[in-house]
Amino acid sequence: MALAQEEYRKQEKMNGIIYDISPSPNFRHGIVSGNLHAIIKNGLKHSGCLVFMRNLDFKYHPEKNDDYVVPDIMIVCDRKQLKGGCYDGVPKFIVETLSPSTALRDRTEKKVAYEKAGVEEYWIVSPQGSVEIYYLEDGKYVLVSNYILQNDKEEEDYNGEDVISLRAFPHISMELREIFEGVDS
């Protein structure tokens, strides 16, 4: 088992500092990211765009240095900017699924990096049932929606059927509960 984890070693480099990215801390992280990836991939058919899940480095300012991150989910439409295992264009959409070891960096350094790179839409998703949606407006991220899943249909504040759409791809939509399907199994 130690060998398998050693082989997985993935890293990010931000502001010249190298961070090890551990494998998903628990199954919930993988389920949430997998659910989103499946919905988005299905919606991108015949669009010319691609969705990547934790397997493509994003060089967020290649003209300045060699810093890069590995978003949990990223949509790219400019295939000319794909070079080996890296993308140095501007993604249309990025999702970071929070884990204890990355939550602070996802909310601070990565958010600023994505904002400066010009990523139009950024979602921060917690496997515990929340989704924060940021849109880039005049060069700054603005929180436009913040969902906390209330999945008990008997409760007055049930919102599992609330529909969320991607800004750049409004035909790609999902119910809030679909993002977290299987997490409590």
Predicted regions and their residues:
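Gly/Pro/Ser/Thr-rich low-complexity, intrinsically disordered segments predominantly at protein N-termini
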Residues: M1-S185
